[in-house]
């Protein structure tokens, strides 16, 4: 039976989570799915566990690869996409899992029903605290990572509405392989690799369908690479912002992205200010100002160069993001004051 979708699983120090992931995977109908694991080489037992899983389930279409050196999640995603031979692919991270046994079945049925560029699913988000996982939001009722899904007709998604109301995560999306490859987009970055890809990909899509199933259980961990507060984290973010605007410009989507009537750019940046200046992040910059000064300067250079500061942060109405935008302005004032002295 021909495989219709590849389940792409980028791995990095994933051994502690693989049992949960394997259990959710084995409940799926995998007759028309291929599973591809790619381990970003590091000194742990992840690759051996993956090889053992493949051997124990040789009735399934499982492929396991390991990089020669550690290159980061972006490079691994690029390599996974290059390995795809099916019409569609779907990213899921090994520290997450499938929500229920019907996820792949619903994906395959949607693929059989019609051709599409992107298929979006619902998610369940968990906050990992101590030894317990608390459900903090059922999506897409109201958005943390996935917001409202507005349908135009039948199962077709209103593209601009979806772009405006959803955050930039590449997991839990069924992606047409030919469509994606024609975009010539690459992930590359070690962190926040989704940001430069997500917007150009969605703006370029002609048909987005809604697959009415909860696809991924997403677990927010305070010790993950993307949540750890550090200088490399913020430098990576700035690099991703730079690449995002380049990608949008190259594929002709920049005008739509910055159009004030769409309010897409404004929402993106206000939510990014939460990433930069909420709670412990704000304290990090205050306590380590001498070390983080260059990072903040680089951020402001980018915002000014691309007109973001004037378009987004000079307007009066910042909504629920007011406090974080004020913190951005606070650091701008501090930097300008020090440069005058």
Curated annotation (Swiss-Prot):
Cited Pfam families: Glycos_transf_2 (PF00535)
Main location, first listed in the record: membrane
Organism, scientific name: Mycoplasma genitalium (strain ATCC 33530 / DSM 19775 / NCTC 10195 / G37) (Mycoplasmoides genitalium)
Stored SUPFAM superfamilies: Nucleotide-diphospho-sugar transferases
GO cellular component, one term: plasma membrane
Protein name (database record): Processive diacylglycerol beta-glycosyltransferase
Entry keywords, A to Z: Carbohydrate metabolism, Cell membrane, Glycerol metabolism, Glycosyltransferase, Lipid biosynthesis, Lipid metabolism, Magnesium, Membrane, Transferase
Cellular localisation: Cell membrane
Activity modulation comment: Activated by the negatively charged lipid dioleoylphosphatidylglycerol (DOPG) and inhibited by N-(n-nonyl)deoxygalactonojirimycin (C9J).
Family according to the record: Belongs to the glycosyltransferase 2 family.
Domain of life of the source: Bacteria
UniProt pathway annotation: Glycolipid metabolism; diglucosyl-diacylglycerol biosynthesis
GO biological process, alphabetically ordered: enterobacterial common antigen biosynthetic process; glycerol metabolic process; membrane lipid biosynthetic process
């Amino acid at each position: 039976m021909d495989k219709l979708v590849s389940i792409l699983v980028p791995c990095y120090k994933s051994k502690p989570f693989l049992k949960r992931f394997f259990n959710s995977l084995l409940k799926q109908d995998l007759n028309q799915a291929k599973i591809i694991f790619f381990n970003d080489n590091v000194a742990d037992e992840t690759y051996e566990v993956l090889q053992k899983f493949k051997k124990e389930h040789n009735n399934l279409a499982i492929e396991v690869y390991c990089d020669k050196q550690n290159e980061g999640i972006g490079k691994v995603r690029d390599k996974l996409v290059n390995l795809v031979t099916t019409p569609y692919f779907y990213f899921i991270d090994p520290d997450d899992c499938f929500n229920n046994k019907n996820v792949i079945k619903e994906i395959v049925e949607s693929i059989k029903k019609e051709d599409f560029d992107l298929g979006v699913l619902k998610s369940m988000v968990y906050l990992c605290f101590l030894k317990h996982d608390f459900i903090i939001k059922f999506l897409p009722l109201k958005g943390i990572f996935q917001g409202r899904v507005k349908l135009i007709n039948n199962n077709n998604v209103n593209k601009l509405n979806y772009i405006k109301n959803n955050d930039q995560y590449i997991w839990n999306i069924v992606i047409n392989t030919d469509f994606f490859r024609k975009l010539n987009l690459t992930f590359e970055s070690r962190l926040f690799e989704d940001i430069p890809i997500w917007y150009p990909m969605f703006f370029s899509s002609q048909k987005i369908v809604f697959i009415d199933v909860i696809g991924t259980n997403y677990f927010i961990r305070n010790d993950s690479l993307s949540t750890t507060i550090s200088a490399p984290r913020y430098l990576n973010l700035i690099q991703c912002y730079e690449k995002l605007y380049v990608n949008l410009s190259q594929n002709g989507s920049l005008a739509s992205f910055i159009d004030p009537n769409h309010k897409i750019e404004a929402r993106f940046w206000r939510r990014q200010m939460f990433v930069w200046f909420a709670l412990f992040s704000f304290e990090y910059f205050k306590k380590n100002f001498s070390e983080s000064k260059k990072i903040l300067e680089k951020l402001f250079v980018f915002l000014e160069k691309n007109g973001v500061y004037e378009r987004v942060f000079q307007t009066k109405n910042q909504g629920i993001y007011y406090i974080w935008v004020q913190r951005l302005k606070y650091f701008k004032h501090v930097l300008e004051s020090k440069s005058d002295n």
